[in-house]
């Protein structure tokens, strides 16, 4: 079951989590362009956001075994003032069979969407370069009312 990690846990295990996030940030073309080959500053920023006792806008989630790491961030639109939860990064650290993967996706959705509602978010955004996540989202349409949109990145 996916659990929100405490700031203390993040501080004590940051080096381990940082390695997993680096892997996630460089594992696909889109994330690699935005976060790969950059300075270490991105990880300092994330660490500071996750451990700031005065702000709880960024969150790190994990299963007890560390099989999955999910990084989320609350965003507020400058235009509409609506709050949403961005699933910034999600990665698994071990290979699992397809049934387990689908079950974990369902459990993660239940846990994170409950958290988003508690934070007064009006929705959740998830970007992915992986067709698999779009296919999973499509399969949940009946019970999540997911709206699948397209996003484009033109590297400059």
Language-model segment annotations:
Residues 144-156:
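Conserved catalytic-core motifs of GNAT/GCN5-like acyltransferases
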Residues 80-140:
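Acyl-donor binding region in acyl/amide transferases
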Residues 33-56:
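Active-site rim helix/loop that mediates acceptor-substrate recognition in acyltransferases
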Residues 2, 55-56, 137-147:
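Short glycine-aromatic motifs
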Residues 1-41:
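Short amphipathic alpha-helix that is part of the acyltransferase structural core
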Residues 55-98:
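Conserved donor-binding loop and adjoining core beta-sheet/short helix segment
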Residues 51-54, 64, 117-120:
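Flexible, charged surface loops at secondary-structure boundaries
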